[in-house]
């Protein structure tokens, strides 16, 4: 069996891992059982990007949510009736926390009676098997996979399977949702589910869609890598009218949505995570008239703050473009800090909707040059120089960053030199190579003769050899030259004597040999 906790830790971002650890700590301190469930587990197993973390608690999660809010989490929407909380966790992580429940229908299509339950009942009441999987985060069963409807097998077969034949009758919004899953994951409907889907379309259940459910589905488009694929699926099944009756005729702005998806990819490569809810809503409704778009947002029960953001999107973007064109952002430092204060989704919208050359050039410099410089500031190098952390430390880093924006201090050698200057640390003197001592009193090419005085030797008892050693240098040179000449002459004399000896005739024999010869 796969180690799902290891899989989680390796697939989650650092921010998501921090949320996971914090939620587990709170569940232990509050003595409640908690599970990672739904889309996070589905995406984990299928290899899709993990967009959000959905947690299910056996009990009421409100205490846990309040503790998370103290640590920086923000609640976007909550329902006491459903015990459901849509949250942006600390670290800008999307997710939700909900209490385990069961939905009981008296008859198909009726409003369900909500009963709070355990995790297994909660998984069985869900829409599709691929969403009915959970991983235990509890101490004694940590990493245990819960899959009561065999959703893992459907993930392997790349199929979306409804859990009951009344799935679309009970909640017609699932017609839009299943098309979104198929478009996102490139899955097909399981054969019986396809039959139930076709029957629901034949009964025109899709024409009764509306309200907050449709609003939630349109919001979900902003999390899709390719929202156009989902919108075209909805269009082919005559579901765009659920957003507004005139949308099938006018159609969403597909070209701008495709550009927006590409720009989002560039922003994410730069380490930014844009929330495209407002731009995606704007382009989905963009070809409707203003009053039609406003009516559509009201019918989808969008929050007043969301409607205001969509209405003011263009004006806000125009102001940013004017600032980027003006003197306010002429200097690279000023442009950097200005753009760092702008929401990433606004940068994406400007690149798509208002491609002013000067503004776009600064945005791209921010993403591709300035921001990487900022993230790579040499804090460790300044630590190594012995500068203590504090106001002075931060000031030096900021001054270095400003110089780097101007093109200075980008290579290691010059960067260290600048850091030393800014910190007031003198450079270490360079070590000079050792040089040979000059030979005193010696001509070039002559061997050095060292004088070593014998221990205990006095001038009165100096031997001739010692006296010669103590003679002046000029006398030594002359003596050495004379000795060399004498040696050379002696050698020549010896050679001449040997030659003469070879040339001399043999001597006459003496004694009896001589007398006998005379006879």
Functional labels for PLM-detected ranges:
Residues 1-519:
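Catalytic cores of the polymerase beta-like nucleotidyltransferase superfamily
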């Amino acid at each position: 069996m796969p180690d799902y906790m290891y899989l989680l830790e390796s697939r989650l971002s650092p921010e998501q891992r921090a949320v996971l650890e914090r939620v587990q700590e709170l569940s232990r301190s509050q003595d409640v059982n908690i599970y990672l469930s739904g889309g996070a587990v589905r995406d984990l197993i299928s290899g899709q990007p993990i967009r959000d973390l959905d947690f299910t608690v056996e009990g009421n999660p409100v205490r846990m949510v309040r503790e998370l809010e103290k640590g920086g989490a923000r609640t976007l929407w909550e329902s006491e009736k459903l015990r459901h909380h849509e949250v942006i966790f600390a670290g800008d992580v999307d997710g939700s926390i909900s209490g385990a429940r069961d939905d009981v229908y008296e008859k198909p299509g009726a409003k369900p009676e909500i009963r709070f339950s355990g995790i297994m009942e909660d998984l069985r009441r869900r829409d599709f098997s691929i969403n009915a999987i959970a991983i235990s985060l509890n101490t004694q069963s940590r990493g245990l996979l819960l899959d009561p409807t065999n959703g893992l097998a459907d993930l392997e077969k790349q199929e979306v399977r409804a859990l009951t034949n009344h799935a679309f009758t009970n909640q017609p919004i699932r017609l839009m949702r299943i098309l979104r899953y198929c478009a996102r994951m490139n899955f097909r409907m399981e054969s019986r589910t396809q039959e139930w889907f076709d029957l629901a379309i034949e009964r025109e259940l899709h024409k009764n869609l509306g309200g907050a459910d449709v609003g939630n589905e349109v919001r979900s488009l902003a999390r899709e890598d390719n929202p156009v694929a989902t919108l075209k699926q909805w269009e082919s099944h005559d579901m765009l009218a659920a957003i507004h009756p005139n949308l099938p005729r006018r159609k969403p702005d597909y070209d701008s949505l495709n550009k927006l998806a590409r720009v989002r990819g560039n922003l994410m490569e730069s380490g930014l995570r844009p929330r495209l809810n407002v731009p995606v809503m704007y382009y989905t409704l963009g070809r409707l008239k203003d009053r039609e778009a406003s009516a559509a947002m009201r019918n989808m029960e969008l929050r007043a703050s969301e409607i205001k953001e969509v209405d003011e999107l263009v004006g806000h973007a125009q102001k940013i473009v004017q600032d980027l064109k003006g003197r306010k952002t002429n200097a690279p430092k000023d442009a950097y800090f200005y753009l760092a204060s702008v929401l990433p989704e606004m940068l994406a919208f400007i690149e798509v909707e208002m491609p002013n050359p000067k503004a776009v050039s600064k945005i791209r410099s921010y993403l591709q040059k300035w921001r990487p410089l900022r993230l790579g500031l040499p804090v460790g190098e300044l630590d190594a120089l012995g500068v203590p952390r504090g106001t002075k430390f931060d000031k030096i880093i900021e001054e270095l960053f400003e110089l780097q924006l101007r093109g200075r201090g980008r290579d290691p050698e010059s960067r260290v030199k600048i850091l030393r200057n800014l910190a007031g640390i003198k450079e270490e003197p360079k070590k000079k190579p050792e040089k040979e001592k000059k030979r005193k009193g010696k001509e070039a090419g002559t061997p050095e003769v060292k004088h070593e005085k014998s221990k205990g030797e006095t001038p009165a008892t100096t031997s001739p050899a010692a006296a010669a050693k103590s003679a002046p240098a000029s006398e030594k040179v002359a003596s050495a030259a004379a000795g060399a000449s004498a040696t050379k002459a002696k050698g020549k004399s010896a050679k001449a004597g040997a030659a003469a000896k070879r040339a001399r005739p043999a001597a006459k024999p003496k004694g009896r040999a001589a007398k006998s010869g005379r006879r």
